[in-house]
Amino acid sequence: MKAKNILMICLFISGLFCLPSKAQQPGENVSHQTIRKLGEKHFFSISTIPDDIFRLMQGKTYKKNCTVARSELRYIRCLHVDKNGRNIVGEMVVNKAIATDVLDILKKLYEAKYPIERMRLIDYWNADDERAMRANNSSSFNFRFISHTHTVSKHGRGLAVDINTLYNPYHKRLKNGKEVVEPATARPYLDRSKNHAYMIKKGDLCYRLFKAKGFRWGGDWKHSKDYQHFEK
């Protein structure tokens, strides 16, 4: 009986090491050995919004006046590679209409080792775009209306994706001569002739993959530039 109990305990302990969901959390590095053991497919998934994630979103990206139903959103988990070659678990909430396309794009970017520094839910920055962009975070859903309208923005519907936000800023020159740069710390990256690991260039892999899925790139806009931004 004692031997049987010991065997059961050993099996239980060994089983703990086979439970990946608690071991690989968003933002954490994953070793190549772990990826080989579990397989890449294990890390790429689309699901309805889990209860714990929906609680996190309350009052942040999912505001009290949110007109987008929870059922319209999807939670993506993936892997991405930073400029130092580290494999990192990423997460993103998007509209279900683009979820499959976005996951496919992120998987291809990972396979090509296209560098993405950070991919966490913007709720960890209290849905503050400026703070999250300064952290070079990549994200999608954040409910809001277009300024001075009752129209929900593309991000507000989860139909826009921002990639490597610090190095690919939003830039607009107003009629009064004032410049708008978001995030404010991204002014050094307005010169698109320079090369930075996290900079999106027209024609690069990130650009081509999003365009192939029918997304529009903010870097192509005429009256402003939003180099981080892809939308449908």
Where are the regions that the model predicts?
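Mid-length scaffold segments of soluble, non-membrane domains
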Residues: 116-117, 131-165
